[in-house]
Design a protein with these regions (language model features):
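Short, well-structured N-terminal submotif of metal-dependent ribonuclease cores
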Residues: 1-35, 45-58, 127-130
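Active-site neighborhoods of divalent-metal-dependent phosphate/nucleic-acid chemistry enzymes
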Residues: 19, 65-110
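A generic structural signal for short hydrophobic patches within well-formed alpha-helices
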Residues: 9, 40-43, 74, 112
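A short acidic, often aromatic-flanked loop/helix-cap motif at beta-alpha or helix-coil junctions
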Residues: 42, 73-76, 126-130
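Acidic, PIN/NYN-like endoribonuclease modules and their adjacent C-terminal/linker elements
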Residues: 1, 94, 98-130
Length: 130
């Protein structure tokens, strides 16, 4: 089960997902399309969309299961912010992945290197893939 980070959604929308990961990405979108509410906000707030591509992006992300912030995610986010100095948005996304036991798919794996108990998949690294 996977949680997609904002950058992965943008790369997918732009057709920039690595060729070796496209089949996996299609499977994830079919079987396990989950995003944090923060990812949804960041993705739809991205300034790179024109009005037509924004409408397509909105329709695309509506197919995802959006995970809202609950008390467990709140508590984990606070701990990550206090102990790890991680940015708020990344802390919420990381806390969501850990709370729901999901593998976070992101290109920015270094942002999450100090997050305990997180599973991260970077499809842009040579040794990534399922």
């Amino acid at each position: 089960m996977y949680l997609l980070d904002t950058n992965i959604l943008i790369y997918y929308s732009n057709g920039s997902i690595p060729p070796g990961f496209r089949e996996d990405m299609d499977r994830i979108l079919t079987e396990s399309f989950r995003v944090s509410i923060i990812t949804k906000l960041e993705y739809l707030g991205w300034s790179g969309f024109d009005s037509d591509s924004f409408d397509k992006a909105k329709e695309f992300v509506e197919n995802a299961e959006t995970i809202n912030i609950d008390q467990d995610i709140t508590d984990r986010t606070i701990s990550l912010r206090r102990e790890g100095g991680i940015r708020l948005a990344d802390a919420v996304i990381a806390a969501t992945a850990v709370s729901r036991q999901l593998t976070l798919v992101t290109r920015n794996d270094n942002d999450f290197i100090n997050v305990p108990d997180i599973s991260v998949l970077n499809p842009f690294k040579e040794d990534s893939g399922n």
